UniProtKB/Swiss-Prot annotation:
This is Zinc-finger homeodomain protein 7. Residues 50-60, 271-283, 301-312, 417-427 have a biased composition (Low complexity). It comes from Oryza sativa subsp. japonica (Rice). Gene3D superfamilies: Homeodomain-like. A zinc finger (ZF-HD dimerization-type) spans 163-211. The lineage of its organism: Eukaryota, Viridiplantae, Streptophyta, Embryophyta, Tracheophyta. Keywords: DNA-binding, Homeobox, Metal-binding, Nucleus, Transcription, Transcription regulation, Zinc, Zinc-finger. It comes from the Eukaryota.
Length: 427
């Protein structure tokens, strides 16, 4: 295909060629230590062979054909080099000290504008050592994006999602809710759809709860430790198949609490008869355990369970231990409560302490028991079942006999006294 060029376009091209020759002479004088004949011989056939394929291959090969790059920069990919001089319609294939070869692409009058627009970027990447090293580093990190623009685009377009615990219900057909317990998504080795399966539970990544990872510098300052740990462990997904952030921002579920299997609960200690003595120390109702029953009491298994102190409600996961009393303790406490009027008064403090020491319960437990068993105040304690109450005032004299015996006793008192006097006289 032939293109018609006007005279003013040819004049502009000649001026550009002269300017380029002067610039390249200066560059070659400043960086002649990087130019080698072997590199030039290797790059010229590449340009000549790629010129017949397509304009894109022309641009790729032309970016490599400049003899100003050091030999150790062969890691730069063609796509990165092409991005350093994107869309240029006026490309130089190779230049020697005495000859120059020029490749022209169809562009017409826009050649001068594109040449002027992309000249700083081309000189910045290919002119000096620092620019070449920066371009190679960015091209390797950005995955072929090339140049500063490619690196920034890869970092800006990468989705910042973090996939946490698996929410797949494995018992949905049965009408139940069963989770597998997977705490975080781990990508499987491989490419494509195989990488979207969790290596821990085998479920697809869409079953895992998704949350935004690091969205702003403010969040980095709030939690730098967690962000660095996540980046080190590779928990942030950077796959190209992920949905952009703005597309699903309205579909995020406001999960305020973790799933039931992720919530931390206090350990539940099983309460058994063997561990009952150990649980007495944690009881909120008493300080002293009732003494063990002797084997002579056959009704020891019929001990009633009474309510304990309700000062502070215990936790829902821990069963509160209730104080157990024997039948003898209940009868003695009932008899004592009848004597004091089912209330503990301050004047009776000494008697209450003495009774608690005898029965084997604390004052607090006795007070709670009297409060919970006020309904027993209507029925007095039975005299047959209760033991004899301890006498409050000890009287050494025996009880007086009945009246008729007392009269008979007075009637026979003088003979007894007389007999005692006779015995003393005989002695």
């Amino acid at each position: 295909m032939e293109y018609k060029r006007s005279s003013h376009v040819e004049e502009e091209e000649e001026e550009e060629e002269e300017e380029d020759d002067e610039e390249e002479d200066e560059e070659e004088q400043g960086h002649h230590q990087y130019t080698t004949a072997a590199a030039q011989q290797q790059l010229h056939p590449q340009v000549l062979g790629s010129s017949a394929s397509s304009p894109s291959s022309l641009m790729d090969s032309a970016a490599f054909s400049r003899p100003l790059l050091p030999p150790n920069l062969s890691l730069v990919s063609p796509s990165a080099a092409a991005a350093a001089a994107p869309g240029g319609s006026y490309l130089h294939a190779a230049h020697h000290h005495g000859q120059g070869r020029r490749v022209e692409a169809p562009g017409g009058e826009s050649q001068h504008h594109l040449q002027r627009h992309h000249e700083p970027a081309r000189n910045g990447v290919l002119g000096g050592v620092a620019g070449a090293h920066a371009a190679s580093t960015l091209a390797l990190v950005g995955g072929g994006g090339g140049g500063p623009r490619g690196g920034e685009g890869a970092a800006g377009e990468a989705p910042t999602w973090r996939y946490r615990e698996c929410l797949k219900n494995h018992a949905a057909r049965m009408g139940a809710h069963v989770l597998d317990g997977c705490g975080e998504f781990m990508s499987s080795p491989g490419d494509g759809a195989a990488a979207l399966a969790c290596a821990a539970c085998g479920c697809h990544r869409s079953f895992h709860r998704r949350e935004p990872a690091v969205v702003a510098p403010a969040s980095l300052s709030l939690c730098p430790a967690s962000a660095s740990a996540s980046a080190a462990a590779g928990l942030v997904s950077l796959s190209p198949s992920a949905t952009p952030t703005g597309a699903n921002s309205s579909r995020l579920m406001p999960l305020l609490l973790a799933p039931p299997h992720m919530q931390k609960r206090p350990p539940v200690l099983p309460v058994s008869p063997a561990s009952a003595p150990a649980a007495l120390a944690e009881s909120s109702s008493e300080e002293l355990r009732p003494p063990p029953l002797p084997s002579s009491h056959p009704h020891a298994h019929a001990a009633a369970v009474v309510a304990a102190s309700a000062s502070a409600p215990p936790g829902p996961s821990k069963k509160r231990f209730r104080t157990k009393f024997t039948a003898e303790q209940k009868e003695r406490m009932r008899e004592f409560a009848h004597r004091v009027g089912w209330r503990i008064h301050k004047p009776d403090a000494a008697a209450v302490d003495a009774f608690c020491a005898q029965v084997g319960v604390s004052r607090r437990v006795l007070k709670v028991w009297m409060h919970n068993n006020k309904h027993l105040a209507k029925t007095p304690p039975s005299p047959t079942s209760q033991p004899p109450p301890p006498p409050l005032h000890h009287d050494p004299s025996p009880p007086p006999p009945p009246h008729h015996h007392h009269h008979h006793h007075h009637h026979h008192h003088p003979p007894q006294h007389h007999q005692q006097q006779q015995q003393q006289h005989d002695a």
